[in-house]
Design a protein with these regions (language model features):
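C-terminal accessory domains and tails appended to enzymatic cores
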Residues: 5-18, 24-42, 48, 138-219
Length: 219
């Protein structure tokens, strides 16, 4: 069995989209709110199972990682947060880089030799790594309109992951992943699933407008 565990924000979703475009795999999905960092506690695995973990703190899940490895699982772990001590184990592959210019999707883009950079750019914008996103976009010679669309998508998908419970969100992260992963590129998603793109971006814009109105009223 294959299990994909990923943060429900733009970085986690776009990282998994890249991997599954490159390596299609039927998998159990485990995800949650942006603040749900101990996602591996929800994972049950057996010897020989393959687990992919994306944009989830290694340090916060290190005990569970050890347990899963001892049960015979194989783990591929990609993240950009401080990991603590990473164990040496033949069944653990960890691609972890804590440089403040990278996010998990940029690491996956590097791992895949730049196969799906548009998804990495989207995630970088969502993680507020605007300079990194623009640097990668410059190599692709994107128009300003294209760049703006990727930025709007990244910000809106990232915002969708904030809430106290799944019902607070416009879309559950696993649902949003399934909708987005049906497309080769973010541009295909934006044009091919306009209803969800519009709901995401308008939901973000409306909430920001409401917040500004409350701030103005408070003053």
């Amino acid at each position: 069995m294959h299990i994909d565990i990923f943060n429900g924000d733009a970085d986690g979703i776009c990282a998994l989209i890249q991997l599954r475009l490159a390596e299609p795999q039927s998998a159990q999905l485990i995800t949650g709110l942006k603040r749900d960092i101990q996602l591996l506690d929800r994972c049950s695995a057996q010897a020989g199972d393959c687990i992919t973990v994306l944009d989830v703190s290694f340090q916060a899940n290190s005990k569970r990682v050890d347990e899963l490895l001892n049960q015979g699982a194989h783990i591929f772990y990609v993240d950009h947060h401080q990991p603590g001590t990473i164990p040496q184990h033949p069944h653990l592959t960890a691609l972890i880089d804590t440089d403040n210019t990278v996010c998990t999707s940029l690491l996956v883009n590097r791992h895949l030799n730049g196969k799906y950079p548009l998804w990495a750019i989207t995630a970088a914008f969502g993680d507020n790594l605007n300079h990194s996103a623009e640097q990668l976009a410059a190599r692709l010679k994107l128009s300003q309109t294209q760049l703006d669309n990727l930025k709007n998508l990244g910000i809106a998908v990232n915002y969708n992951s904030y809430g106290s419970c799944i019902s607070d969100l416009h879309f559950a992260p696993d649902t949003l992943y399934r909708e987005m992963s049906a497309f080769q590129s973010p541009f295909d998603f934006i044009s091919g699933n306009r209803a969800i793109f519009t709901q995401l971006t308008q939901g973000y814009q409306q909430d920001m407008a409401n917040a500004q109105a409350l701030t103005a009223e408070y003053r």
